[in-house]
Curated annotation (Swiss-Prot):
Protein topology in the membrane: Peripheral membrane protein
Name the UniProt record assigns to this protein: Mitochondrial import inner membrane translocase subunit Tim8 B
Native species: Bos taurus
One protein family per Pfam: zf-Tim10_DDP
Xref: InterPro entries: Tim10-like, Tim10-like_dom_sf
Primary role: Probable mitochondrial intermembrane chaperone that participates in the import and insertion of some multi-pass transmembrane proteins into the mitochondrial inner membrane. Also required for the transfer of beta-barrel precursors from the TOM complex to the sorting and assembly machinery (SAM complex) of the outer membrane. Acts as a chaperone-like protein that protects the hydrophobic precursors from aggregation and guide them through the mitochondrial intermembrane space.
GO biological process: protein transport
Gene field: TIMM8B
Lineage start: Eukaryota, Metazoa, Chordata, Craniata, Vertebrata
Free-text note on domains in this protein's UniProt record: The twin CX3C motif contains 4 conserved Cys residues that form 2 disulfide bonds in the mitochondrial intermembrane space. However, during the transit of TIMM8B from cytoplasm into mitochondrion, the Cys residues probably coordinate zinc, thereby preventing folding and allowing its transfer across mitochondrial outer membrane.
Amino acid sequence: MAELGEADEAELQRLVAAEQQKAQFTAQVHHFMELCWDKCVEKPGNRLDSRTENCLSSCVDRFIDTTLAITSRFAQIVQRGGQ
């Protein structure tokens, strides 16, 4: 097998990083689903009632807001460290 050139290796690393990000995002979504499901759904049925739908929506929104706040704060810390 031929060795990869620098450009090919960089592209491969970029693709691997993108796949890792997708996997991390998927894992995070499943984690949110599990936590919010356990918090909001008392007994599964054919349909979700409005209270359960609102609870699930609010739960996911809280996790997204928290994740964005933490990410933003971390970026600020990293940026200050690089100055």
